Swiss-Prot record:
Pfam families in alphabetical order: Glyco_hydro_4, Glyco_hydro_4C
GO biological process entries: carbohydrate metabolic process
Record's protein name: Maltose-6'-phosphate glucosidase
Gene symbol of the encoding locus: glvA
Record's catalysed reaction(s): alpha-maltose 6'-phosphate + H2O = D-glucose 6-phosphate + D-glucose
Quaternary organization: Homotetramer.
Organism: Bacillus subtilis (strain 168)
Catalytic site: D172 (proton donor), Y265 (proton acceptor)
GO cellular component, one term: cytosol
């Protein structure tokens, strides 16, 4: 019997990640057939440059797929089975400010962590809710697979503000680290490992890694990470210097709890001074991306569109993003795939807030995810997570209530911020920088000396 084929819209069609994801989808058509693929963005000029290349890819590799790029929500979201969302409200220019403003005060400037992550979250909530509402209006049976950052804040916003929506929040960072673990172990794929992991998004720990026969792989991995971080003896592909530093720093992060293996983002919370020291406030990661990947992808897309051929293209398939197909297949075909998702705790972690959005392994089928019970977690992780989940909840409350006070409290609670005064100074700058993107906050009347 012929498999059903699906209609997909990629929300954030103008993203520089879109071409690699489209190539990945075209590479997995046997497992996940597609009849229609649409790109949606509110920036027509940007999306058109990406879409020109994607149109060529599809005509060359799968001409039967109906392709469209649109800025019209009704056209984009009508007759779709899956919405794949990777939006960036404010683009990289705003990310640069998210990073630069905290650094001005000697505080971590990072895309998803600390004040920068809070600022990005405040911009992202409205955009993700808007896409979710379009999907429910025009294709009420569809599922939204959201990998827009900052995933923790976005997931809390959808839990609180759209509690009955068919949205799955997923992150690629654990996937990327597990790819590196597989390389370290000499395995051909991360899928040869069975993992146990818990935490919040960008804030978690692996507690068990086994092979398919049940052999414990943790001792070998822990020994390697304690010496080299997540850097394999031989790299499978070239890694940017800033990412190389991150993977090496896992050595120090792991030392805080040698019984587990950490998510690399914990470096920003456990070693914030080190992160600030190696940052350039005038040239942050956002600048690197704009000058590097963004310039490269757009020049490649322009060339492909001009030549109407991908023969000379250097854009690579984003194999790393194949987890998106795994997730879509799990929903479509009830595969029972085991995946890390960001879901409401609801007892999965016994001694933690039941309403917190936690990142844990789930079994995914046609009705969505079923979290695998983690049990009781240690005081060290519990304490860190309680502080961080409070930051996320207060940020969403601040957005919903337009509350300056609650947003200030979120920054005060962030482990990256040293005190309330610095939190206030950063927030006042962020409010000014984000006036075109955030809700207008009720300016707190309370002044500090």
């Amino acid at each position: 019997m012929k498999k059903k084929s699906f209609s997909i819209v990629i929300a954030g069609g103008g993203s520089t990640f879109t071409p690699g994801i489209v190539l990945m989808l075209l590479d997995h058509l046997e497992e996940f057939p597609i009849r229609k693929l649409k790109l949606y963005d509110n920036d027509k000029e940007r999306q058109d440059r990406i879409a020109g290349a994607c149109d060529v890819f599809i005509r060359e590799k799968a001409p039967d797929i109906e392709f469209a790029a649109t800025t019209d929500p009704e056209e984009a979201f009508t007759d779709v089975d899956f919405v794949m969302a990777h939006i960036r409200v404010g683009k990289y220019a705003m990310r640069a400010l998210d990073e630069q403003i905290p650094l001005k005060y000697g505080v971590v400037g990072q895309e998803t962590c600390g004040p920068g992550g809070i600022a990005y979250g405040m911009r992202s909530i409205g955009g993700v809710l808007e896409i979710l509402d379009y999907m429910e209006k025009y294709s009420p049976d569809a599922w939204m697979l959201n990998y827009s950052n900052p995933a923790a804040i976005v997931a809390e916003a959808t839990r609180r503000l759209r509690p009955n929506s068919k949205i799955l929040n997923i992150c690629d960072m654990p996937v990327g680290i597990e790819d590196r673990m597989a390389q370290i172990l000499g395995l051909s794929s991360r899928k040869e490992m069975k993992v146990r992991y818990y935490g919040l998004n960008h804030f978690g720990w692996w507690t068990s890694i086994q092979d398919q026969e049940g052999n414990d792989l943790m001792p070998k991995l822990k020994e390697h990470v304690s010496q080299y971080g997540y850097i394999p003896k031989t790299e499978a592909e070239a890694v940017e210097a800033s990412w190389n530093d991150t993977f090496a720093k896992a050595r120090d992060v792991q030392a805080a709890d040698p019984d587990t293996l950490p998510n690399t983002y914990l470096q920003y919370y456990l070693f914030p001074d080190d992160m600030v020291k190696k940052s350039n406030p005038n040239h942050t990661r956002a600048n690197e991306v704009m000058e590097g990947r963004e310039a490269f992808i757009f020049s490649q897309c322009d060339m492909i569109t001009r030549e109407q051929s991908s023969e000379n293209s250097e854009i690579k398939i984003d194999d790393h993003a194949s987890y998106i197909v795994d997730l879509a297949r799990a929903i479509a075909y009830n595969t029972g795939e085991r995946m890390l998702l960001i879901v409401e705790n609801n007892g999965a972690i016994a001694n933690f807030d039941p309403t917190a959005m936690v990142e844990v392994p789930c079994i995914v089928g046609s009705n969505g995810p079923e979290p695998i019970t983690v049990g009781t977690i240690p005081q060290f992780q519990k304490g860190l997570m309680e502080q961080q989940v409070s930051v996320e909840k207060l940020t969403v409350e601040a957005w919903a209530e337009k509350s300056f006070q609650k947003l200030w409290q979120a920054l005060i609670l962030s482990k990256t911020v040293p005190n309330a005064r610095v939190a206030r100074l950063i927030l006042e700058d962020l409010v000014e920088a984000n006036k075109d993107f955030w809700p207008e906050l009720d300016q707190s009347p309370t002044r500090i000396s």
